[in-house]
């Protein structure tokens, strides 16, 4: 009988895969090959999901900011442009949190953005007259 040098390692690696597949349906949690395929597929989805999560949160933040901006009489793009013109550098996560939890503070930010846009517009009109 030939000598087996990888027995312990193979058993451990298979056990690891089957442990990861516990909770999967039918043979995907019992048979090594099916479990391996299911685990690989699951890991791919997990990897993609970690990348998607960033996009999804950014979209959610923008939706929340836009809703509060519309209530304050501004569009999202004008609001963000107004904040940049005012020199405020707040990220979307913070803005969405303020919009969700502190309506008065968000209205102050919207007024600040409106005034910065008005100053910028008046400066542009003054340059056009010259």
UniProtKB/Swiss-Prot annotation:
Instruction: Tell me the domain of life.
Output: Bacteria
Q: Which GO terms describe its cellular component?
A: ribonucleoprotein complex; ribosome
Q: Which GO terms describe its molecular function?
A: rRNA binding; structural constituent of ribosome
Instruction: Keyword check for Ribosomal protein, yes or no.
Output: yes
GO BP terms in the entry = ribosomal large subunit assembly; translation
Q: Which PROSITE patterns match?
A: RIBOSOMAL_L20
Coiled-coil intervals, chain numbering: none
Instruction: Note the Pfam families from the entry.
Output: Ribosomal_L20
The family note in this entry says: Belongs to the bacterial ribosomal protein bL20 family.
What is the protein name for this chain?
Large ribosomal subunit protein bL20
């Amino acid at each position: 009988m030939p000598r087996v040098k990888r027995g312990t390692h193979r058993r451990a690696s298979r056990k690891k895969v089957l442990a990861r597949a516990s909770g999967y349906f039918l043979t995907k949690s019992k048979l090594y090959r099916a479990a391996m395929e299911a685990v690989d597929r699951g890991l791919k989805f997990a990897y993609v999901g970690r990348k998607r999560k960033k996009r999804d949160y950014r979209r959610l933040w923008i939706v929340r900011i836009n809703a509060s901006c519309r209530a304050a009489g501004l569009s999202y793009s004008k609001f963000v442009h107004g904040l940049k013109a005012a020199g405020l550098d707040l990220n979307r996560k913070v803005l969405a949190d303020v919009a969700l939890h502190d309506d008065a503070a968000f209205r102050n930010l919207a007024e600040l953005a409106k005034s910065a846009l008005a100053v910028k517009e008046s400066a542009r009109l003054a340059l056009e007259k010259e």
